[in-house]
Amino acid sequence: MKAMASADWYFDFVSPFSYLQCEQLPQLERSIRVRYRPVLFAGLLKAYGHKGPAEIPAKRRFTYQFVAWQAKRIGVPFKFPPVHPFNPLPLLRLAVAADADPEVIRRIFRFVWRDGRLGDLPIEWAELMTEIDMPDAAARIESPEVKEALRRNTDEAIARGVFGVPTLAIGEALFWGADATAMVADYIAQGCRFADPEMARVADLPIGVEREADKRK
């Protein structure tokens, strides 16, 4: 019997698109083994010198409306938290402290993006800890081991070329964004490769012109 292929799923709770893909992963997990890898999206942005979508006003507005539209279109319950962006570090460390358990991660995502809460109020944090059955979470997320594991995940993602979240990495193939989920399903169905020769051709397409470096720097 052929072994099931595996993928690493890089995500950050600050990303609503990570939530949308998290809700769709169980369908993919029928045919591929997924390892959940929490990473700090801000660390990826810093590594590549990019701005996040929320740092460009017009893009921020469109992104928020687009993800709300997309959630409704695919039938995923969705509600923005009171503010965004927010500091995801406590939640990311919580996922690490829970050994990246998929069910815990899914519950955290739903707490933020289905229920529209952040856990930044003591009563909300207590409710989340009860929901995931981790009463000692406040101490665990401050452990050096947990903090280092999150840094290691982020460094690993950067080393693999991951530039955004969510990203599914299957070997050297990277699939970025919740709207790439169907593409991942096709890739798996084709034996973790793309049979279309045009897909192979564009993967190594020559660069015709490059933008000049900003001379003001």
What are these regions, as identified by a protein language model?
Residues 2-8:
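Extreme N-terminal starter segment of soluble prokaryotic enzymes
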Residues 6, 14, 18-32, 107-217:
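C-terminal cap of thioredoxin/glutaredoxin-like
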Residues 1, 103, 165-166:
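Alpha-helical interaction segments
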Residues 4, 46-50, 73, 87, ...:
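Generic signal for short, ordered secondary-structure residues
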Residues 13, 17-115, 198-217:
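Structural alpha/beta surface segment adjacent to cysteine/selenocysteine redox centers
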